[in-house]
Amino acid sequence: DPPYNTGNKDFVYNDSYVDSEDSYRHSKWLSFMEKRLKIAKTLLSDKGVIFISIDDNEQANLKLLCDEVFGADNFRNTLYVRRRTKTLNLQFAENGLNSLNVGAEYILVYARNGYLFKEMRVKKKDLPSKGSWNVFWSNADRPTMRYELLGFTPQTGQWRWAKDLADEAVENYRDYLYNHAELSLEEYWEQTGRSKKFIRRIPNGFGKNGGVQYWVGPSDTFLRTSNWTDIEVSQIHKDFELPFNNPKNVELIKEILQAPFYKTSFILDFFAGSGTTLHATMQL
């Protein structure tokens, strides 16, 4: 969580605060960051990862710098995190605005080499009542996964599951149609332990997938993407008796700390600030 270079004297270069009047403030900030990022790279393990929080002031410059330091191939994601928006002064809004209110900040994610995310799931606000049918064909290219299924064999791409699992899913759906059609597929899935898989083929299906579909049951979670706008980036400083204007949200840091696929990690916070990283670590 480095200084954002907002022009409000938020970082020191050569023993002097840098403000918005300094015509070299962007280059000074980049020099300030480059030294620290190079040290960070030497400390990262082969499976290490670095998360860097930033806003619009330097996001574009920081991305280029990180591509240079860590290698563009080691860029993983830009995470988008919700920012508390300020109330607009309606007196000025009525005359037109130079720009829209800023509603998000960014977290750049770079790996050393072999970093892996685990599957991260987020609770949905409302549980869907229906499952959905999805295309069973994938554009990956493993010839061993191109087998005959329901009278169709893909010529390119592949099926999503191994043949034995797919054949079982076909039989599951046939059993449902012939013996349990008085139930909805969702009800049947619930009654059988929410574990059965189903595959069908749409009549006269054509195209790369031949109309073959697999069923995904209702879920109270969804797979997390790079859109983290369900989490606010900062906590209101008045919530804490701390001399910091924008302490990071503990829940955000906890989510970051739980992102790695690996069970054990060493955690380093270069700009400890209000101690949120330690706080989050102790809560895990």
Q: Where are the predicted features?
A:
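A phosphate-binding catalytic loop at a beta-strand-loop-alpha-helix junction
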Residues: P2, S265-L284
